[in-house]
Amino acid sequence: LKTITHPYDFVVIGGGLSGLCAAVTAARQGIRTALVQDRPVLGGNASTEIRVPPVGATQCNFGFSRETGLIEELFLNNLLRNPTCSPEGWNLELESLARNEPNLELFLNCAVCKVAMNDAGDRVTGITAYCSMEETWHEFVAPYLADCSGDGVVGSLAGAPFRMGVEARSEFNEPMCPDEPAPDTMGMSLHMHARDAGRPVPFTRPPWVDLELGPDDFGPYRPVCEHFFPDTGGFWWLEWGGALDTVHETRKIKDEVQRITLAVWDYLKNRSPLAERLTTYELDWMGAVPGKRESRRFEGDHVLTMNEIDEQAHFEDAVAFGGWGFDHHPPGGFHDKLNPSTHQYLRGPHNVPLRSLYSRRISNLFFAGRNISATHYALSSTRVMLTCAQLGEAVGMAASHAVKSQLDPRALTEGSAVRSVQSDLLLADHHIHALEMPVIGDLAPRAKVTASSVFSESTAAESWGIDRLSDDRLLQIPVASERLDTLSLRVDADRDTELTYRFHQGPTNGSTFPEDQLAEGRIRISKGSDQWIELPLQVDIPRPGWHFL
């Protein structure tokens, strides 16, 4: 077979959002970069093959913590050029992001099979990937590599130490862990999509799908009928395989999840309360590649823990942030009648240190994505794709500094070296939670902002919906001024009544938990609709940021 050797400064393995962001970031810093992907498309779990919606910090109430930098650029371009958000249009945006970079070469359909090591066995000198489309071996030689492949194929072949399964509670004192370690991971999912064909379309369950489901098979936690129409991501619980080896038994897991998915469609189509409504619907797409949540987690100089995420721990070498809660899935998936996800929300956004993004043993190997140095329960937060994209961007920037300075990843975690990485990340519109530092060349601190229009009472919409105050409510608002005298609310009252209120400041860590109370009071409200009432707060604001009513 034909063999081609490619010399690069930096090679990224894995074309999901983490690998794509790592490769593009490094290339934009002038680094000759290769992106090696074993699938025909980019995007990983967000690709047209799997179609999991990317989520991140803003889905958990951190309203001004949307992931910025490269992933924001990608999303804005997708909205501009793919306004209907079609899967194929999204695929084109992903590939265009890579192909538009002159310093980046994309190698699709190339599966890594071998790694070459130095004599000491602590450094990867090259990798070999096979492209079946052209019956060619591609050898990549580079001083630095990033394994963003999810399963960590390069790290595994190189002998980098890793973890799988759940740690014992005693190892890191994580409260959700069992007393003893367990091999269980979170399972894999297949998504499906149906369309209205405009005429009756029958569906017959294939004979090999020997699973006939009824309403009792879904239990109280899987509202299959409620999910079908409003939410394209509603079938994330079509999941299984966490009790198996999520690397070496992927084919077996995929077959069973496909069987479950077809059985669910058979129930929806033929026997569910939606059956009559779905008479004209046909299954027009089903994933052929399972979306993975968890497999290997490679050990770095620091293992990120659940407690550090929950406590918003400070790291001098912080390079990326996350905000998704602890989202743990039972290993039995669909066949386990427990709640398919135990989701514990966070106090606020948290950071990830650079020391968790490289191997502690292989000196030139970075990691980004779901294979980073984290515990099982920490990964249940960091594994979501917008967080992974942030990790990839951080690794790409760190790799560019490593190439230019000829330093290994470990040497970038302290002093001026890590501050330089952080500064360049901030200049690229990347976000690191609660990090404030001067950035050379940053024009934003001196910029002036003007507005073409101002929102006022007269321009308010007639209604944004009604939030009834029969129970307590918490309103989260940003306050930038040094004093707040009044706060106006628009209310409807079906009788004369009284409103009790308290006003709290927020914490300094970006959390959405109220802290010290600044004001309280009661105000009479007369019967009537569409009234603006003023709460006389009369308070000094100790610090700008989140406040709560």
State the predicted function of each range:
Residues 547-549:
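Long, compositionally biased intrinsically disordered regions
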Residues 15, 38, 370:
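Cofactor-binding loop segments of dinucleotide-utilizing enzymes, especially the Rossmann-like FAD-
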Residues 3-16:
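Beta1/beta-strand and adjacent pyrophosphate-binding region of the FAD-binding site
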Residues 45, 113, 121, 126, ...:
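Flavin (FAD/FMN)-binding glycine-rich loop and adjacent Rossmann-like elements that form
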Residues 19:
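N-terminal Rossmann-fold NAD(P) dinucleotide-binding loop
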Residues 7, 25, 31-32, 37-118, ...:
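Conserved N-terminal/central alpha/beta ligand/cofactor-binding core
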Residues 488-492:
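Short edge beta-strand/loop segments characteristic of extracellular beta-sandwich folds
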